[in-house]
Amino acid sequence: MNSQIFKIINKNNLIKTINNFNKCYYSTSIKKPSSFNKSQNIFDKPLRRVFFNVPGSDRRKIDKAIALSDKIDSIVLDIEDGVAINKKEEAREMIKKSVVEDSFGKAELLVRVNSVDSGLLEADIDMIAKIPTYIDGIVIPKVEHPYHLHYITLLLREKCGDKNAANLKFMACVESAISVINLKDICNYSLGTDTPSQLNALIFASEDYCADTGITRTPSATELLYARSSVVNHAVAHGLQAIDMVCINYKDQEALKKETLEGVHLGFHGKQAIHPNQIEIINDCFRPSLEKFRFASKIVEENEIHQSQGKGAFEIDGKMIDMPMVKWAKKVLSIETFYPPREEEEDQ
């Protein structure tokens, strides 16, 4: 896609941008981007087990996140829902100062901007344009269509320059019914066939999703199974990471553990956190159990023996093992390289 087709835009002509985008994105005369490699290892991307949200207007909480940065994979400095309307500019100034002057250790540093439709995004991007090399990416809320990513991409290029803009990773928040429906198009978005997608992860925002759909939250969270599974399936199919919802009962450690392990079992690669008390439990839950690791090791070892003997399926501890199970075992062992196994037995 010729980038000259699109003019750098501002909020006032967003509708024109949407129309131009649709003409090009859905045109049969334009070659669509080639399919993602479905076998792509999600660990080619940074670990994002703990995705820690911090209000950008709260200096005390920013300092706390910095102090805990060795236990956090991604620190998200929020200008959106975590900041009151009359504190937005204060948050921008505080974030700008903090990312330049403070050390966040090895943690990935992200800024959560306001949504495309909020009327506040442009001021956020103006701030980011002054610090593009100090952050790793941006969290984009309320992504419902690929043109939301398109608009932000062009805005960043205008304000930050092509090179700095291209180096910023995107994390798209799934917060509504239409967002879930449009996940395939959102995941497939890139500025052109020769431009790698900046999208790295999908983030499920359960409370916003419930507010949009009218779903009533229950302790079991079964009402969210479809949406959570959709996020994971689309993310994995496109080589992206999937970040699970916030556990709002942040003082209930057992509820957090249960919800986090459910996310692990569904295939999520990390979980959002809003309180320091959640960090240790989330980190621990994303480590495979010692029991699972030992079983996976045994499968791989036995498979090598049976393959050398020209045998296919085999049995371990009364369970039939075939190639899908061998692939599962190898994936568990690859995860163990990054997440040392935990001592207790596998949670049910």
Where are these regions (language model features)?
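Expand to "…catalyze enediolate/carbanion chemistry for C-C bond making/breaking, isomerization
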Residues: 2-348
